[in-house]
From Swiss-Prot:
The lineage of its organism: Eukaryota, Metazoa, Chordata, Craniata, Vertebrata. This is Sal-like protein 2. The keyword Transferase does not apply. The modification Phosphoserine is found at residues 243, 794, 799, 803. It comes from Mus musculus (Mouse). The gene is Sall2. Disruption phenotype: No overt phenotypic abnormalities. Histologic analysis of the eyes reveales a colobomatous phenotype, with delayed apposition of the optic fissure margins and persistence of an anterior retinal coloboma phenotype after birth. Deficient embryos display correct posterior closure toward the optic nerve head, and upon contact of the fissure margins, dissolution of the basal lamina occurs and PAX2, known to be critical for this process, is expressed normally. Anterior closure is disrupted with the fissure margins failing to meet, or in some cases misaligning leading to a retinal lesion.
């Protein structure tokens, strides 16, 4: 450990030898080095000390101010024994008075030497000064503020302190003085500790700063080259001095700089952070400035630069290798990036000085190891181009401009994607791939178009407003405030109100118009007759208009907002009224426009019919000008007319897809499917809700309440326990459809079922749908995880839910339902089911139940016929039940519940797992999947095997969030997997093929 880190290393010797030396008065001078009273330099050789006194001409820059000093002579002359604290107090007191020199005393005070050595090793910092800085020859050794000391300028140095009071009489006990001395010692130790912490912080910051640059420092100037320093100075380690001198004071001499440093020496925080807020290449007085620039050519020493290269000093950072640059950049990159953002002027190099400015430090930190870091948010990018694109998100710069509509984009790729919208309308216009400065949007070219535009804005509006060419835009009818500005602009153009805004440029009229339009634009549904009354009311508010214009002239918005235009009625002095890019009509206005356009098209159709022209079908909202299947409200292009109709229903808030289990309605079939899977994966809820009258089980409480109301209303007889599960569910669902269908629910009739082509295109549209109702899918995530460990349920509970659902829901869940039916056939004895009712009771069912059952059955049969064998439902139906037995009949009819799995029309049952197959070949292929020691169930996603199906279900629900698709092996298994959300037919697992391997079965 160095002497600076020790706590008073010579204190014990001072306490032991002090009294004897002072009593004898013959202490040797070589044991106690002599200290200069002016510069506080200490020497062990008296000859060197005398030579230094002759050359030293500087007043002491440091004055230690501690109260309660004692006279060194009196304390040394005292022969009474003193405690250790008292001796240390005298050591601190002697520092206030001038130390004895060789001329005034034959032997210095015994307490001065050892203590002074400890103080010098812990507090003194030597700096080599240039000879030219002081204006002449002679070296200078400065001392940093002592521990617990305050540096003062020479002119403000106070007079020597008054002599301390004499020591107490011998009669007073030493215990009376222990308490104040101990407190004084504690205060000194505290100040010393604070000073050491400050110095440690400064050293760490300097090491990180210089280590981040990855530079190596040359050999420092040897002590022998420093003029005016003796041989004793070579034994002292030279440490860097962290001077708080400001750069504005560097033109003065070093003596004046040291004196001015005392003004800011009382602010250690600013001193510690000084080098972080000033460029390294600036005229900075502290010695590390030269170290930071040592990798560049060394400039000649200058009188105005006290921090030049002859102040190179050995510092602790020399021991650190150059590899600390990346670590330091990672530690300080974010903080300095924020500093660079706060002071952008520092990002540039110095004015041709060839020195490293602070901006260069930042640029080197932005690219640690070839990476590029954002100076605003400290994100790191792999290339400079990516960093520049990212910086545009902070600056708001959008350099790429569409030359058709004037919209701006941050990247060229976004502009390319946007420009595809204009390809159909403007095939002859080429996209401008080059950046267009935003300030050029203010310029109107000789052709009358804004700079960077290839198509007049009004031309695009005319095409959009032609009959059958999209929504016809009405001229904006602004409110009183906006019309006041418009009328005033008319006065400005005619010169009648030039006194309001004299010399106003032409384009500023457009700017003034848009300054009030975004917040005062009236709804497009305003009747045309109200425009004249509004203008008449404006004529009475001329003074308010002029006051408003005077405010608008002082706050003009950007001209970039004036590139999207609307047609005007001609009453304005300019050809069109501008509309900002961000401003758009409300959804209510868009719907009103759509209704008006449909009414106009209907009126045209009626007129053509009256005149004998051939009639057309019901007008579609889309048009040729806006694309074959483009929404005129949000300009979205859809895949087919059916998808467009569903899309318009979403704009209108329609929810035609209704869940028959809980009654919730959804806007898309995809949302309904996702919601219904939540019902399928929550078997625990089925045992919780049962009817108290007929003991029928339901999925949720809402359906149970409706069922109980039907019991109380007489719609269901109290002997409903004799009803079959399938029939009861159908009756419940049919009654629920009549009682709980809301105004936004429109189930499609059977005659309007979509074709397979439209169904596929509609599913594509559902994949593109962005406005998903996330809350509708909460049951999929929540209930799926709750029922992970539950056993497989029987088909009776599943058919209770599916029997009354629409054909859309039945299509989506047909495969899981069929598989669960096969599963239940195997484990039917293990589940508690109500006894199947006898056939005569089925004849007593009310008519609504039979009608609902027949409707659903017919709908599902119709869907199966339309889709043919391409439908997974049809494939599974043919394989699972035979071509002569429909799926609905197997699910809902009571006779199907009585059938044994092996009794249905030649079906073959597996002896191991109990599944039935239509042919012997399929059964043999299935039996190959069973190992010899028993059934093994394998996950199709991760190929993990399980001994029972329940464990596999839990694994697939928890690990893969999928519904286990238990289907017979073969090509239809892949079709079943395609119905599972998130599962495709091509599962990326090693060695998985559509047909299961013999040695690696998938599932029974």
């Amino acid at each position: 450990m160095s002497r600076r880190k020790q706590r008073r290393p010579q204190q014990l010797i001072s306490d032991c030898e002090g009294p004897s030396a002072s009593e004898n008065g013959d202490a040797s001078e070589e044991d106690h080095p002599q200290v200069c009273a002016k510069c506080c330099a200490q020497f062990s050789d008296p000859t060197e000390f005398l030579a230094h006194q002759n050359s030293c001409c500087t007043d002491p820059p440091v004055m230690v101010i501690i109260g309660g000093q004692e006279n060194p002579s009196n304390s040394s002359a005292s022969s009474a024994p003193r405690p250790e604290g008292h001796s240390r107090s005298q050591v601190m007191d002697t520092e206030h008075s001038n130390p004895p020199d060789s001329g005034s005393s034959g032997a210095p005070d015994p307490t001065w030497g050892p203590e002074r050595r400890g103080e010098e090793s812990s507090g003194q910092f030597l700096v080599a000064a240039t000879g030219t800085a002081a204006g002449g020859g002679g070296g200078l050794i400065l001392a940093s503020p002592k521990l617990g000391a305050t540096p003062l300028p020479p002119e403000s140095t106070p007079a020597p302190p008054p002599p301390p009071p004499p020591p107490p009489p011998p009669g007073v006990g030493s215990g009376h003085l222990n308490i104040p001395l101990i407190l004084e010692e504690l205060r000194v130790l505290q100040q010393r500790q604070i000073h050491q912490m400050q110095m440690t912080e400064q050293i760490c910051r300097q090491v990180l700063l210089l280590g981040s640059l990855g530079q190596t420092v040359g050999a420092p100037a040897s002590p022998s080259e420093l003029p005016g320093t003796g041989a004793a100075s070579s034994t002292k380690p030279l440490l860097p001095l962290f001077s708080p001198i400001k750069p504005a004071q560097t033109g003065k001499t070093l003596a004046s700089s040291s004196s001015s440093s005392s003004s800011s020496g009382a602010e250690p925080p600013k001193q510690a952070f000084f080098h972080l807020y000033h460029p390294l290449g600036s005229q900075h007085p502290f010695s590390v400035g030269g170290v930071g620039r040592s990798h560049k050519p060394t400039p000649a020493p200058s009188p105005a630069l006290p921090g030049s290269t002859d102040q190179l000093i050995a510092s602790p950072h020399l021991a650190f290798p150059g590899t600390t640059g990346l670590l330091a950049a990672q530690c300080l990159g974010a903080a300095r990036g924020l500093e660079a953002a706060a002071s952008p002027g520092l990002l540039k190099p110095k004015n041709g000085s060839g020195e490293l400015g602070y901006g260069e430090v930042i640029s080197s930190l932005e690219k640690p190891g070839g990476r590029h870091k954002c100076r605003f948010c400290a994100k790191v990018f792999g290339s400079d181009s990516a960093l520049q694109i990212h910086l545009r998100s902070h600056t708001g710069e959008r350099p790429y401009k569409c030359n058709v509509c004037g919209n701006r984009f941050t990247t060229r790729g976004n502009l390319k994607v946007h420009f595809h919208r204009h390809r159909e309308k403007y095939p002859h216009v080429q996209m401008n791939p080059h950046p267009v400065p935003e300030h050029l949007d203010y310029v109107i070219t000789s052709s009358g178009l804004p700079y960077g535009m290839s198509v007049p804005p009004e031309k695009a509006e005319e095409e959009a407003g032609t009959p059958g060419g999209g929504v016809e835009r009405k001229p904006l009818v602004a409110s009183t405030t906006a019309l006041s500005a418009t009328e005033s602009l008319t006065l400005l153009s005619t010169g009648t109100s030039t006194a309001v805004a004299p010399g106003l440029p032409t384009f500023n009229k457009f700017v003034l118009m848009k300054a009030v339009e975004p917040k005062s634009k009236a709804d497009e549904n305003t009747p045309p007759g109200s425009e004249g009354s509004a203008i008449a009311g404006v004529a009475d508010s001329g003074s308010a208009t002029r006051m408003q214009l005077s405010k608008l002239v002082t706050s003009l918005p950007s001209w970039a907002l004036l590139t999207n235009h609307l047609k005007s009625t001609g009453s304005f002095p300019f050809p069109y009224v501008l509309e900002p890019l961000g401003a758009s009509p409300s959804e209510t206005s868009k719907l009103q426009q759509l209704v008006e356009k449909i009414d106009r098209q209907g009126a045209v159709a009626v007129a053509s019919t009256a005149s004998g022209a051939p009639t057309t079908s019901a007008p579609a909202p889309s048009s040729s000008a806006s694309g074959p299947n483009q929404c005129v409200i949000c300009l979205r292009v859809l895949s087919c007319p059916r998808a467009l109709r569903l899309h318009y229903g979403q704009h209108g808030g329609e929810r035609p897809f209704k869940c028959k289990v809980c009654g919730r309605a959804f806007s898309t079939r995809g949302n309904l499917r996702a919601h219904f899977v939540g019902h399928k994966t929550s078997p625990a809820a089925r045992a919780q809700n049962s009817c108290p009258i007929c003991q029928k089980k339901f999925t949720n409480a809402v359906t149970l309440q409706q069922h109980v109301r039907m019991h109380l209303g007489g719609q269901i007889p109290n002997g409903g326990s004799a009803l079959s599960e399938g029939g009861g569910a159908a009756q419940e669902n049919s009654s629920e459809q009549s009682t709980a269908s809301g105004p936004g629910s429109f189930p499609q009739p059977q005659s309007q079922q979509p074709s397979p082509e439209e169904e596929m295109s509609e599913e594509e549209e559902e994949d593109e749908e962005e406005e998903e109702d996330v809350t509708d899918e909460d049951s999929l995530a929540g209930r799926g995880s709750e029922s992970g460990g539950e056993k497989a349920i029987s088909v009776r509970g599943d058919s209770e839910e599916v029997s009354g659902a629409e054909e859309e829901v039945a299509t989506s869940v047909a495969a899981p339902t069929t598989v669960k039916e096969m599963d239940s056939n195997e484990k039917a004895p293990q589940h508690t089911l109500p006894p199947p009712p006898p056939p005569p009771d089925n004849l007593d069912h009310p008519q609504p139940m039979e009608q609902g059952t027949s409707d659903v059955s017919g709908a599902m049969e119709e869907e199966a016929k339309l889709e043919g064998t391409s439908s997974p439902m049809a494939a599974l139906t043919q394989e699972g039940e035979g071509t002569s037995t429909p799926l609905v009949e197997e699910l809902n009819l009571p006779e199907a519940m009585k059938k044994d799995p092996g009794e249905s029309s030649g079906r073959k049952a597996c002896e191991v797992c109990g599944q039935s197959f239509p042919t012997q070949t399929a059964l043999e292929e299935h039996q190959k999947t069973h190992p010899k020691d028993g059934p093994l169930f394998t996950c199709v996603f991760c190929r993990q095997g399980f001994l029972d199906r329940a464990t596999l279900k839990k694994h697939m629900l928890l690990a893969h969030h999928q519904v286990p698709p238990f289907a017979p092996h073969g090509p239809q298994n892949i079709a079943t997997l395609s119905l599972v959300p998130g599962c495709s037919s091509s599962i990326p697992s090693p060695g998985l093929s559509p047909f299961p391997r013999k040695d690696d079965p998938t599932m029974p």
